[in-house]
Amino acid sequence: IIGIWDQTIPATEDRKPPEGFVEGTLYTEEDINAALAINNMSERMRLVPSTDLSGHGTHVAGIAAGTGILSDGRYKGVAPKCDILVVKLGNPISKSFPKTSQLMTGVDFAVKTALARNQPLAINVSFGNNYGSHDGNAIIETYLNTAANYWKTNIIVGTGNEGGSRTHTAGILTPNV
């Protein structure tokens, strides 16, 4: 893991956001490795208190980059030798979605980081919502298309888990019926 930008942890005098950004806290590869070297969990969490409360981010990271170490190499991710840059999108309030602007700043940070490291980039956007028109013209759709054309960037967006639940519907409303 080359870094974690946790937008849910407010910046302090000791904990800063990434350069050029105003919210959250950036934990560097050095911070993460120093925390992992500590056996005491509370001390480790003092250094890097970012956690995946739902397990979803960990699950998605395993699919992308799992090494198979816990399964004797049987279950590996798509790219087990890749570097991981975590952006925990922002809203410290339970059961709420991050703002579109937080996703956009996360993508911007990832692209800038990949460019600075001269590395290709795959961004996995795996959080669900049903915002917008879904016709390719919403601000987030336009932004992601533009970002995907910059540098060596692929952006993968989950299509949802709703199946046939009719989250979106179409029809004609008839007055007084």
Task: Please report, for each region that a protein language model flagged, where it lies by residue.
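Subtilisin-like serine protease catalytic core
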Residues: 1-101, 118-119, 152, 167
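Substrate-binding/access-modulating region of protease and related hydrolase catalytic domains
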Residues: 91-177
